[in-house]
């Protein structure tokens, strides 16, 4: 469990080693890619196991909370988002929720063409919302 959580965090930090990216489309695409890749699938298997195992649930929940906070923080940095502005925090969280949803949709079918259209739309929405 710890390995999967650490690998997801490492992959996230490695997205843009120089920090904030000027291209929000690239940031959105990279975040979505994290949720459509093998590390997300591995995490999902842990989630399913934890949903039925009372002893496992607290540990997986703790790890996911940590990875979730780090993902949010890194997304804010990469998007140059100012969370002191009302609605910005929720916008970033919505982006991450959308990315997770696309990851779930990708489990059974490859919807890369639709996913690219959604990524493009979200990048435009973020440009408007974040300035």
What spans do the regions from the language model cover?
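Secondary-structure edge/capping motif, primarily at the C-terminal ends of alpha-helices
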Residues: 19, 50, 106-110
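Amphipathic alpha-helical segments used for helix-helix packing
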Residues: 36-58
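Hydrophobic/aromatic-rich alpha-helical bundle segments in the mid-to-C-terminal region
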Residues: 57, 61, 78-130
